[in-house]
A protein has these predicted regions:
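A short acidic, amphipathic alpha-helical/loop segment
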Residues: 64-68, 129-131, 144-151
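Lumenal/extracellular "mature" regions of secretory-pathway glycan-modifying transferases
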Residues: 96-99, 112-119, 154-157
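Structural alpha-beta junctions
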Residues: 75-76, 106-116, 150-153
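A structural signal for isolated positions on well-ordered beta-strands in alpha/beta enzyme cores
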Residues: 78-80, 118, 136
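Donor nucleotide-activated moiety binding/catalytic core segment of transferases
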Residues: 114-134
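Alpha-helical substrate-recognition element adjacent to the catalytic core
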Residues: 19-108
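Non-catalytic pre-domain segments flanking phosphatase-related domains
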Residues: 1-26
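Acidic, Mg2+-coordinating phosphoryl-transfer loop and its flanking beta/alpha structural elements
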Residues: 135-168
Length: 168
């Protein structure tokens, strides 16, 4: 697989335009869901209130994203979530966060059938926690993308629709 950092306006090499049966992963907070736009989000999370995860507004056109993801799955691709839990929390709060994130997905992307959902310890390497770390990852965290790029391709949250449109 060709490894490179994507830049808006560049062409994908032919090998990448013809990918089939790839795995496409998404981070949630700051990528699909605008957690940081929720009023008092940090204070709520520190007090172990998981509601900001459900209250977050979408960061892209989710109708278009759902159409693209459904098309990807019809073409044999698999779709997954790999997202971190909150920092330093109890087991009960971790479970509440998992439930809230899954509710957000069900409410905002109900037509998407997720092949994998991994909601893992904060800071854990995402490339170790999924079935195929040579797939594609969309994540707002540059350090996560840098690690992922050792085997796969990663893109920022700003590029989701453009990249999926070009790959499919």
């Amino acid at each position: 697989m060709i490894k490179y950092n994507y830049r808006k306006g560049t062409e994908f090499p032919n090998e990448e335009r013809n990918f089939r049966k790839m795995r496409i992963y998404f981070d949630m907070d700051g990528t699909l869901a605008d957690l940081y736009g929720v009023e008092n989000w940090l204070e709520k999370l520190r007090s172990e209130d998981s509601s900001p995860y459900e209250e977050a507004e979408p960061m892209c056109d989710l109708r278009l994203l759902a159409r693209l993801l459904n098309k990807a799955q019809k073409n044999g691709n698999e779709i997954g979530i790999i997202s971190w839990l909150s920092k330093e929390a109890t087991a009960e709060y971790d479970e509440a966060v998992r439930i809230s994130k899954k509710r957000w997905l069900a409410n905002h992307l109900p037509s998407v059938v997720w092949n994998e959902i991994h909601i893992i310890k904060y800071g854990a390497p995402k490339h170790f926690n999924c079935q195929d770390n040579s797939g594609i990852l969309f994540d707002d965290n540059e350090d996560v993308r840098r690690l992922w790029n050792k085997r796969g391709m990663s893109f920022s949250e700003e590029d989701i629709i453009e990249v999926l449109s070009r790959l499919l």
